[in-house]
Amino acid sequence: MGVPAKAAHDGAGEGESTIGWRLDRDQRRELLQQFPPRYAKIVADHVTLRSRAAAAAALPEETLGEIVGRTDDGAGVEALAVSIGGTTDRPDGSTYHITWSLGEGREARESNDVLAERGFERFDLAMPVKLLPARLR
């Protein structure tokens, strides 16, 4: 049984695990049609809550979110901003997001930097997204 995202984040301890949410596979296919990836390497599979968490860290309880915007640095990093529990603000101060696609030589973790530097363009209409609490690593 999960706990609220902030409690899961704050109580995650230290370790090599990553906790967050996976995207529902069927909805992922629909989202890839709705938001065509701009770069060749498609990621589009999860939202991170906390990296370097303990292996026994509790998973978050939230199961719904909203895709509320998009960012693209024009050089190979594209991400979709996600609102969870009414906020895009992750407890660590960064932004909840899905790394959507990457260009050659770019890495998913760079989405955090792009969002911090550029923010995101908010959509007129948010898109509901199913979230599956998961140990991502």
Predicted regions located by residue number:
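Histidine-dependent nucleotide/RNA phosphoesterase domain, centered on the 2H-phosphoesterase fold
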Residues: K6-R137
